[in-house]
Design a protein with these regions (language model features):
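Alpha-helical segment proximal to the catalytic Tyr-Lys
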Residues: 130, 174-175, 236
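Catalytic loop of short-chain dehydrogenase/reductase
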Residues: 139-164, 169-178, 190
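Short, small/polar-rich loop/turn modules that mediate ligand/substrate recognition or access, typified
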Residues: 177, 182, 238-240
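A conserved structural motif in NAD(P)-dependent oxidoreductases
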Residues: 212-223, 234
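Short C-terminal tail/terminal secondary-structure segment
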Residues: 228, 239-251
């Protein structure tokens, strides 16, 4: 049975493809109007929006915005509210993941990771608060790697940034919880996306797949349902949580 998100408006960053696209499709299938965000994949984003609109459940618009900058994130927020008149659900799916040895880590790498993963989501949340009413939802994306007692090498910046996200969620959950707005972190394990595959050999990809009991990577469509669940009214008592969706990756 579809979850009832009729009348809700959602903005999903980085949603032209991968996990973000699956989230957009699922929220729309459950009745929400969705703002699809892209930076360069205009044709892909428009095709996704058209396919959602053709299904006749939810609605969708595609908005170009560079969410690695605060200005770009605020532009996305403004265009989303302009398109649908309000905001109920804000999902920070866009992210950066680069693995490298410490000797090769640059100041730009550091700034890039913390900008798109931490700084922009924080300040877009700040800008979104006036639009979010009681029952509003803010969802950040972290990673199951922060739970590992033995994190993989060369993921220094990514894991550090996501660790910051998790603490940001804890504090925001209290600050915004007083307004009836929940804030949670979705923590997937390895998911078969371009972001995950980028810079890895097939041997490395298979290594991560073998850490799962089912010996495979997750698909984006296996992550989207938890976002749809947390978006529904019945999930209003779930707040400040790290929700692991990883197939037993680190049990």
């Amino acid at each position: 049975m579809a979850l009832d998100l009729s009348g809700k408006v959602a903005i999903v960053t980085g949603s032209a493809k991968g996990i973000g696209a699956s989230i957009a499709k699922r929220l729309a299938a459950d009745g929400a109007s969705v703002v699809i965000n892209y930076a360069s994949s205009a044709a892909v984003a428009e095709e996704l929006a058209n396919s959602i609109n053709a299904q006749g459940t939810g609605k969708a618009v595609a908005v170009r915005a560079d969410v690695s900058t605060i200005a770009g994130g605020k532009h996305l927020l403004e265009e989303g509210v302009k398109a649908f008149g309000k905001l109920d659900i804000l999902v920070f799916n866009a992210g950066l993941m680069k693995n490298d040895v410490l000797a090769n880590v640059s100041e730009k790498d550091f700034d890039d990771h913390f900008s798109i993963n931490v700084k922009v989501p924080l300040f877009v949340t700040q800008a979104a608060v006036p639009y979010l009413k009681p029952g509003g939802r803010v969802m950040f994306f972290s990673t199951s790697l922060t739970k590992n007692t033995a994190p993989p090498p060369n993921y220094l910046l990514y894991i550090s940034a996501k660790g910051a996200v998790e603490h940001l969620v804890r504090v925001l959950a209290k600050d915004l919880g007083a307004k009836g707005i929940t804030v949670n972190a979705i923590c997937p394990g390895p998911v078969d996306t371009d972001l995950f595959r980028n810079g890895k050999t097939e041997q490395q990809i298979q290594f991560f797949a073998n850490l799962h009991p089912q010996k495979r990577l997750a698909s984006p469509d296996e992550i989207a349902p938890i976002v749809a669940f947390l978006a529904r009214d019945e999930a209003g008592w779930i707040n400040g949580q790290k929700v692991y969706v990883n197939g037993g990756f680190n049990v």
